[in-house]
A protein has these predicted regions:
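Bacterial flagellar/type III secretion structural subunits and associated motility module proteins
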Residues: 1-76, 81-189
């Protein structure tokens, strides 16, 4: 068995702004994850990084993206993180700006298929990849099931190219607990 890669959640970040209260412009952000989209209207007076973060997180139709603000030595950045791991959960952000927009909301756009974007990918959306006896299986999370009948691999660390030996055995304690639970339930029913 070789764990070639672990699934990760996509994370993208804006350029740095002076602070989280900085106005970034007005318009509409359309955020897409796994083929589903939702929109956030950004209006004058609620166009700061803080307000946009809140609008994304509070959107009732949010399709699986969490927004946060990270402050580093360069300033405040809006960070979007996919709620689920895997390639299909890559984040895309398109922007429609208002004609009267004096800011530059388009700096919050991101296309995972484009070579250059205003927002920067901090963590790529990846699937887990496991190899067993020359057979490869991918999974959008850290669990690989069905590759070998009755066996589920719970992945915790990738070691590309490094082969590991896995012993598969029956968990007799789990069987014992299941039988004891059945007997207890049966006895409770008959008393």
């Amino acid at each position: 068995v070789s764990v070639e890669q672990l699934a990760t959640r996509n994370k993208i970040a804006s350029a740095a702004y002076a602070d989280a209260q900085t106005s970034v412009g007005t318009g509409t952000l359309s955020i897409t994850v796994n083929g589903e989209s939702f929109s956030v209207d950004v209006e004058s007076g609620s166009d700061s990084l803080e307000a946009i973060r809140a609008a994304i997180n509070d959107a009732e139709d949010n399709v699986g993206v969490s927004a946060s603000i990270v402050n580093d030595e360069n300033g405040a950045q809006l960070v979007l993180t996919s709620d689920n791991s895997g390639v299909e959960n890559a984040i895309a952000v398109s922007v429609t700006t208002d004609l009267a927009d004096t800011g530059d909301l388009s700096q919050l756009s991101y296309d995972p298929n484009a070579g250059s974007n205003p927002m920067i990918e901090k963590v790529a959306a990846l699937d887990s990849i496991i190899e067993v006896d020359g057979f490869t299986q991918t999974s959008s999370d850290l669990t690989v099931a069905g590759m070998i009948e009755g066996v589920t691999f719970n992945l915790s660390e990738a070691r590309p190219g490094e082969k590991m030996t896995v012993d598969v055995s029956l968990d007799t304690n789990a069987v014992k607990r299941a039988v004891e639970g059945f007997v207890q339930a049966y006895n409770n029913l008959n008393t």
